[in-house]
Amino acid sequence: MIDEKQLISHLYQNRENGQWMIQTNDEHQKGVADMAASFAGQFGLPSWGRALGLLHDKGKERAAFQQYIRKMNGLPTSDKKRYDDHTHAFVGGILAKEFMGKDVSHLLVNQIISHHTGLHNFGDVENILKERLLSEEINEGDISINKPLLFQEFIDSPFSKSKVEWEHFHHLSRMLFSCLVDADRLDTERFMDVESWRKRGNSATLADLLPQLEAYMQKLQSNAADTKVNRIRQQVKEQCSRTSSSEKGFYSLTVPTGGGKTLSSLLWAMKHAVSHSMNRIIIAIPYTSIIVQTAGLLKEIFGEENVLEHHSNFDPNDIKDEENREKAKLATENWDYPIIVTTNVQLFESMFSNKTSDCRKLHNMANSILVLDEVQMLPTGFLQPIVDALKAYQEMFGISVLFTTASQPVLSGLIEGTNPKADFKGIEHIKEIIPEEFALHDQLRRVKLAIDDTGRTYDEIAAKVSEYNKVLCIVNTRKDAKELYDRLPNDGVKLHLSRMMCPAHLHETIGKIKTLLKDESQPIVRVIATQLVEAGVDIDFPVVFRQEAGLDSVLQAAGRCNREGRSAMGHTFVFSLAAEKRNPFGSMADSNNARLNLPEDSDWFAPSTMKAYFCQLYSRKQTFDEKDIKHWLYKPTELCFETASKEFHLIDDTSINVIINWENSMELIEQLKESGCTYSLVKQLAKFTVGIRSYDFKQLKGYGLVEEILEGIYVLADRSQYNKATGLSLDNHWLEEVLMI
């Protein structure tokens, strides 16, 4: 018989013997407090984590909640009173405000009342509390709290004796929220779902994994030919190894394409982490197309049990080993893995989110290394809040940041924009790992760059491209890709790449290109692509064409040319389309104009030229905070977490996903119709999904070409509108792609 005075937090009935298994509220709160204290201890605030844990579920001790949890689970109760409200989170918020004082309640109250709903705007917190009858709610039932203990916990906190920059205050609030949310979910899982709890953790440490990386790189070196390129790669590797024990902070690794940046940056990160006892490495990449390549390499080195992919196109069901598959599914919730590979979108939108599911992982970023690959792809419209966030995480949470690229943007110092509000305030000090005297841009110069600003027709460009047998042509829009692809002759293999192809076909085509380029029996391979291939995709053509764009894009395109130095010099041609055609617009026009404003005799590959280019580009910007995140978050008394979360989106989130009814997806679509929407089905179908602009979607829907099989889930009804080689179209008019970063 269960004691009716027992204060229950969670319960379930054992299926084998029918016995009721109960976790008391005291047990749960202490479990959460211990875990949250451990998490917050990573950045020096264990007492704050403990206070959050001890207070967060005090409202479960209300008679209303105790009656509710018993009735919901079929447990008898003698309490026949009718209660209008059985919610519980607000009580802990009231206690935090009552017992901890005005100065700190802003930090704790919101986290506690929001641990199931997501962080509220500051003004809404007061309104939520005012709606409650404070004294009646607190005194109802047996709600007890050790007030002296909590005060002592707070007094002992180092934060009470330190200062936080006001503009960083929201990051501290969100980080403490993360500690509470993850601790709450984990302690609940430990009681309610022991099987899942046991699958978590138990991954290797970075110290365990470092020898595997060193052995892999040594094997590569031993099997590599004695070429100039390979000698430079070894030089870069050794420099990364030498500098890895430097103090925590901001670092950049600027290495021309083909210089071994991926592995050398990983070596630096792992050795830096081991020397500072850091927890994990988080690698953020702009394109999902690059992630598959990078994650594949890391899994080859460390095993899939130590590398977590977390992005929209990854389906954990693709992991063959059941134990690793289940671990990966669980780890996407909180990033408790040694190595995480994710997108800029997943990373930065989580850092500015108010949602429990997004924020839960954030505390595991503390005392970690963040590698931002292809950093020049960070959107300038969000650059100021992103840089401010990185500074906050470095100063308060002990991370190190490594910026890697062949085209390093200017992220330090002050750059004046078109008006005072457009000034960009960068990071005070970023240390470059590769010294200037290495002159890598000269040593790795394997490409001649020719720029022709004369407006050319599609026919002229197609004819020029067709003069070469193995050639890549990168253009700015889907329209341009269509026009040029159609004009190429069919005398060999011609391929197309854009995001109007579903991820399954896109990755299949990239793999096919890599295979064909190694096949000497296939003399003609011509590829027309949008800019998705120009950063990080490991392909190597002797000749590359690039439609006019910013200097960073031009050099990234040149990085797909003669990467391995197989010929003395590769050739990259920059071309312009005739005025009536599709020339750069919007931000692409800003980038192109910044390049055009540089001296014609510039050394396009020199780091000094790249710096001048970015200064030109930034000086043209109206703002580096286009959604005014500073307004919503930089004043502690006006923290608008929910509003900022809705505003901070790096890509156009008005796009609509359409599932392509094609081959393997057909069976999955039928399952979706029969069984409804499940996490597993959504992840599997993501590989056969294309995101399109709302305008184009309206056209498809207007013609009856898409079918809504479930609310908000659309399938292409007319398969003739999709071509595996070229993607989704509307009556042969190719739609524009949505840029995915």
Could you describe each region identified by the protein language model?
Residues 2-215:
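Accessory nucleic-acid engagement/destabilization modules that flank
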Residues 10-16, 309-322, 476-479, 494-514, ...:
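Conserved helicase motor
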Residues 247-269:
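Walker A/P-loop
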Residues 278-302, 311-314, 410:
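Conserved Walker A/P-loop ATP-binding site and its immediately adjacent core
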Residues 303-352:
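Inter-Walker segment of RecA-like/P-loop motor cores
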Residues 344-347, 358-396:
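SF2 helicase catalytic motif II
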Residues 394, 459-468, 474, 479, ...:
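C-terminal helicase lobe and adjacent C-terminal extensions/tails of nucleic-acid helicase motors
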Residues 407-466:
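Interdomain hinge/linker at the junction between the two RecA-like core domains of SF2 helicases
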